[in-house]
């Protein structure tokens, strides 16, 4: 099964991901956690270009295509091989990030970005996506705890950009209700984790029941 975690920076999705992995392994599932942009040697090199604070003048389409190129490398060399071995893959970000950040916030258009991704990635969709929905104030507070030094080029965007990203995510949730489930990420990490693992275990049980029939 292929699961993706999505949300604004500071939503707590990465912390929850690690706790989910630990619990699934305790239940004897084989799990691979990975991230985007990156997750593979060449994809990580592309990540450095995308997030480098020096690259402030990057064109919106250049940015989008770099994300998609990194994603395809990650998909072909890491995600697909793991799925073929019946390993549960959980990725910190995937296609919906590019739709929200570049399609919505960079004003390229969600539909256009989705079309390009479908062509390049051959319609590869996650089985389940969790959107970690957090308020701007809570996300900012968590980002401050992480420290300014941890901020990359996209973290440093203005609030107007982040608002567009958020609206992009809400639109994706609205248009993909079967795949994308919402997590209330304003709660403490244990409550956030409990929401996430409940949905994931239900999906796993559903898949296992379908396979056995």
Swiss-Prot record:
For biological process, the GO terms are: dTDP biosynthetic process; dTTP biosynthetic process; dUDP biosynthetic process
Protein keywords: ATP-binding, Kinase, Nucleotide biosynthesis, Nucleotide-binding, Transferase
The family database entries (InterPro entries) matched by this protein are listed as: P-loop_NTPase (IPR027417), Thymidylate_kin-like_dom (IPR039430), Thymidylate_kin_CS (IPR018095), Thymidylate_kinase (IPR018094)
Name of the featured protein: Thymidylate kinase
User: Has the keyword Transferase been applied to this entry?
Assistant: yes
Q: Could you tell me what reaction this enzyme catalyses? A: dTMP + ATP = dTDP + ADP
Q: Listed GO cellular component terms?
A: cytosol
The enzyme's first-digit EC class, named in words, is transferase
**Function, please?**
Phosphorylation of dTMP to form dTDP in both de novo and salvage pathways of dTTP synthesis.
Annotated residues that bind ATP are located at 7-14
Q: Does the keyword Kinase apply?
A: yes
Similarity annotation: Belongs to the thymidylate kinase family.
For this protein's source organism, the top of the classification is: Bacteria, Bacillati, Mycoplasmatota, Mollicutes, Mycoplasmataceae
Query: What cystine pairs are annotated?
Result: none
The EC number on file is 2.7.4.9
Gene source species: Mycoplasma capricolum subsp. capricolum (strain California kid / ATCC 27343 / NCTC 10154)
The protein's matches in PROSITE patterns, at most eight in alphabetical order, are given as: THYMIDYLATE_KINASE
Q: Name one GO molecular function term.
A: ATP binding
């Amino acid at each position: 099964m292929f699961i993706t975690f999505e949300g604004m920076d500071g939503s707590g999705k990465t912390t929850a991901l690690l706790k989910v992995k630990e619990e699934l392994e305790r239940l004897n599932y084989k799990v691979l956690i990975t991230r985007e942009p990156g997750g593979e040697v060449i994809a990580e090199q592309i990540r450095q270009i995308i997030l480098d604070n020096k690259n402030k003048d990057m064109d919106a389409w250049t940015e989008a295509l770099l994300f998609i190129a990194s994603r395809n490398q990650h998909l072909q060399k890491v995600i697909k091989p793991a799925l073929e071995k019946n390993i549960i893959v959980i990725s910190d970000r995937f296609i919906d990030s590019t739709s929200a950040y570049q399609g919505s916030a960079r004003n390229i258009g969600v539909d256009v970005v989705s079309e390009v991704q479908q062509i390049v990635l051959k319609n590869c969709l996650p089985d389940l996506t969790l959107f970690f929905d957090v308020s701007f104030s809570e996300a900012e507070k968590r980002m401050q705890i992480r420290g300014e030094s941890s901020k990359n080029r996209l973290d440093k965007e203005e609030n107007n950009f982040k608002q567009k990203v958020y609206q992009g995510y809400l639109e994706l949730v609205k248009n993909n209700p079967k795949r994308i489930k919402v997590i209330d990420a304003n709660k403490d990490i244990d409550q956030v984790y409990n929401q996430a693992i409940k949905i994931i275990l239900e999906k796993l049980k559903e898949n296992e029941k379908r396979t056995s029939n």
